[in-house]
Design a protein with these regions (language model features):
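Short acidic-hydrophobic surface loop/beta-edge motif
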Residues: 1-8, 100-105
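Short beta-strand-to-coil "C-cap" segments at the C-terminal boundary of structured domains/repeats
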Residues: 133-137
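Conserved beta-sheet core of the metallophosphoesterase superfamily
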Residues: 51-131
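Binuclear metal-dependent hydrolase catalytic cores centered on His/Asp/Glu-rich metal-binding motifs
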Residues: 3-48, 52-58, 120-123, 128
């Protein structure tokens, strides 16, 4: 992670790939990273490739992170009009978390549908998305 100042605001920005569970998972490196990452009064912004641990398994309630940007689920890859995403490997059919803004613990997650596709599966009814946010604290 890096500590910086943006428009006069003290900010800590970091990134992680995995599920970000509170208990040791794999080699415990994610937990060591997050324990150090949250030890600040700065605005904490985390880039997390995988949203499921933070949203489905509620680990964002454990980690004191203000804002998370995530992707990984590609907006559900295939979207059913007026319904939403068709499938996510973690949630199954008609998943709740495919894109959007979600309150989690004491923070917020912005889940982007992104630009790419997964494993060569074409995007259907699912426009590519780049998220632009104004952060006001």
């Amino acid at each position: 992670y890096v500590d910086t100042k943006i428009a006069g605001q003290e900010v800590r920005i970091g990134g992680a790939y995995g599920y970000l569970l509170p208990e040791d998972w794999k080699d415990g490196s994610e937990q060591r990273f997050l324990k150090a990452f949250v030890q600040t009064d700065r605005l904490k912004i985390l880039l997390s490739h995988v949203p499921e641990g933070l949203l489905l398994w509620k680990s964002m309630e454990y980690w004191d992170v203000d804002l998370v940007f995530s992707g990984h689920v590609h907006g559900g890859q295939v979207r059913v009009p007026f319904v939403g995403g068709l499938f996510d490997p973690e949630e199954g059919f008609f998943p709740a978390y495919t894109r959007g803004m979600f309150s989690c613990g004491n923070g917020t997650m912005i889940l982007s549908a992104g630009l790419g596709s997964s494993r060569g599966i074409p995007r259907v009814n699912n426009l590519p998305e780049i998220v632009v946010c104004d952060i006001v604290r």
